[in-house]
Amino acid sequence: MAEEFIGKAKNIVFIGEAGSGKTETAVNLALRLARVGGRAVHFFDMDQTKPLFRARDCEVELERHGVTFHFQAQYLDAPTVAPGIAEALRDEGSAVLLDVGGGAHGSHMIGQFSQLLRGEETLVLYIVNPYRPWSGSREDIEITMRRVLGAARLGEFSLVANPNLGPGTTEEDVTEGLRRFGELFPDEHPRFVCALEELCSELAGRVREPLLPIRLNTVPEWLEGSGMRGE
């Protein structure tokens, strides 16, 4: 099921700073939607920040599971937008996932589609990893959120907790990360929580929010098996 994570939304925007796990969250949710069926699933990689982990690095995996992957190759440093976004957003038969860069630059790119990203059909998810440096205080996060959401001309959003230290994340890391999340946002609950799929069965009795199992798809070869605990 996907409704516990996105409700009735068909257009989902993913925003978050580098290291938040934004792309992994978007990729795993896209794969889940493809398994559920009922709608064609379109994934638009709009992250122009050239981070180490990008959705386009797992294009083959997405396509293999029936997700149509879209991105526009950059020419030098010129910002580009993949074609077909407006059509997909309007199409009732399509679920659309927009993976947007964490900076205002990437957010400006989707600002042109802001009129199509309104109402209950759209869900804006702001991914927070409380272990990342710029998640050190609520003020830091709110400054980033205001900057990014303002540039994208988006209003309401939901927080997603993604407490992780990379491939070596443990169950204790997740619960400690959720404690930190609670300190950052004492009056709010995350819409859902992300955790490595092998940890979810143990966490199910300790986490009250829906758990989205994460299978790492964008870990580069040099990091696999390295024992490093970072994204």
Predicted regions, residues:
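Conserved catalytic-core segment of NTP-binding enzymes
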Residues: 104-208, 220-221
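Switch II (G3) loop of P-loop NTPases
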Residues: 72-75, 94-109
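Conserved lysine of the Walker
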Residues: 22
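Hydrophobic positions on the alpha1 helix immediately C-terminal to the Walker A/P-loop
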Residues: 25, 29
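Phosphate-binding P-loop
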Residues: 2-9
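Hydrophobic anchor at the beta1->P-loop junction of P-loop NTPases
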Residues: 14
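The conserved Walker
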Residues: 18
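N-terminal phosphate/diphosphate-binding loop that engages ATP/GTP or pyrophosphate donors
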Residues: 31-80
